[in-house]
């Protein structure tokens, strides 16, 4: 009966492929264009538009093993991970789906056959629930499948009726449970003991047969569908005779690795489960492009990492450890998900860097928390304490709650939320947002795009829009948007800028400045340059050819750059964003550190070599799964149709792309990197240019080089040598100037000592030194203290920009009476500043030189009271 988790995953897919289902790869953990979801949390998420009827697929049956995350947002299992047998932040959902193909009879039959024949589970161990009004499903289970009627339970809508939202597709569901036997406590679903571990839900079959309207009424769908989900970890536990998901082969391998790297000896410690669970969600999220940050999905990832690190320290980890477990994750899941191996270097680097950052404050934060708990009255940690740990030491509130839970305490969530709200209010800045009419505009039309084949064509004006409202006509000088029946204008997508050009009419010209999409309609923005435009007018659309061609060259360059980066830095490099314009490209990609000069040189060489090879740029239409299996690069977070456009440039680059491109790579002429920088944790940006735009950049650079040659009296051959000589000479002069200033300061100090005053037997120097470098004040004070042996010095100077610099020095024998920090702040206050330092030396600044004389006059009376 025992099967490995990997065998079950593959066997499930094979079973349904043999039943005529299309095997579909897991969708991204980051849902595309679905603001209702923080992370993908069910197998049906990637098919949502198919169920809604807004997306057509080439098949009507599908099967998948979907990676899911439930942490943060509405669906959040984070707090329970490690404390229960079946809660995880990351899990896999096995599923089979029907889009208007088969329905209840086949879905129930497939599930029963898989469980009892393919897996060999005893039939008397399986119980079933049905929606209490779904007599059809009940009849199938009892009369056709042969399940004992006492094992078929009717359950209400709360647990056995599923809906996508308040409106839309919905329907009853049927759940299958496994009975672990009388030795395990718990009762059947629907009873008071249902939360026990005896009866475990393993499969949920949803029958989407209704469409719910806003008024609550429901009507039958013309083509009912099926959505099913079975947790891989749960069915693996049953097949491996385990009562906890954490006892299955996959988790046992991870738990042993956690124990190894942390030095833990008790393999039953709950913290081992926490860390083993968290390496899965963290590894997969980073592979899917999520980076640790302080907001949104990135903050959820950061919370999970920090929770894992804290539990690792509980286990005894003394050094950075979390990234070391990733290797075991690859061992356990790398065959099913090759991306884990491809991005190994990148993921480990991100995990290590994040842990190192948190480790700096973890111990101190725990000390603060322990101190607060020692003085805590009651069982609730105050919200302001929770906020302090978050704001100062980076403790997410749920991490503090986790620690509190271990000690039988809770946190004041309302108080924490209030403190957070007050911080946001303090940090809030006024922002003005323009209205994006393309997002508010609803145009029930599909524009035919002809721009791959031609840059001009005839069309009819179907809609005119001004500031989000439909109009019938635009006159000369009016700005607005034009929607056509067909267009050669490419609409902004995939980072490529929208086309510009003209719409020529019999009685006018509309100048197109940009093109975007609204649904399936292409929206041409611009103004009427001459005459007028009316709905139903015939137009001749002409794209700005030179601009389009330049954009196409830069778009092709992003593909070559992407490939070159992966060849140079590793396969962890993936595109995170891009901007393709007529005169430049901007390419964002995943990488953990700045590129060295050698790496940039290698990338540039590889791209230009591909340009010199003059590869033909070939485009093909392919099935999405076929394209992925051919190793065509798919962009993170991008949603693709079933038929995709694949752009290939020799054997150098193959990507899924709907943009416009050069005909051959040689058309790019020359590739030149302008800059490389970091824009976020783990994300770098390259700005570059090709073609005539690159020629222009080189011309400008040569002009600057010629100008530099003239200034240093050199030429292109010895320019570097001349500049080095100039820099060396400058450093020598700077050193001489510094030495002269030091001598002047020393002399000034000697003169000041001669004029020192005495206050109660103590030598005191108070002076405003004009023209001295503020950096030399400290040296002057040190020299004066050494010469006086016992005394107090207060010096000030005003720079050319009216900035006041202050310093106070107190000899060691006097610091019990006078603290340098208190003294310097006495003077700093009137000049609009403050400072600090050691008891014997402190510095401050200010911005009100007019008050300096009065401020220095405060020193003597103040010292008289203390000496």
UniProtKB/Swiss-Prot annotation:
Which reaction(s) does its UniProt entry say it catalyses? tRNA(Ala) + L-alanine + ATP = L-alanyl-tRNA(Ala) + AMP + diphosphate
- Cysteine pairs forming cystine bridges in this chain are none
What the entry lists under SMART domains is as follows: tRNA_SAD
- An example Pfam family from this entry, by short name, is DHHA1
Q: Which cell locations does it reside in?
A: Cytoplasm
Domain of life according to the entry: Bacteria
Q: Which NCBIfam families match?
A: alaS
Function recorded in the entry: Catalyzes the attachment of alanine to tRNA(Ala) in a two-step reaction: alanine is first activated by ATP to form Ala-AMP and then transferred to the acceptor end of tRNA(Ala). Also edits incorrectly charged Ser-tRNA(Ala) and Gly-tRNA(Ala) via its editing domain.
Q: What is this protein called?
A: Alanine--tRNA ligase
- Provenance organism: Psychromonas ingrahamii (strain DSM 17664 / CCUG 51855 / 37)
What is the taxonomic lineage of the source species? Bacteria, Pseudomonadati, Pseudomonadota, Gammaproteobacteria, Alteromonadales
Name the gene: alaS
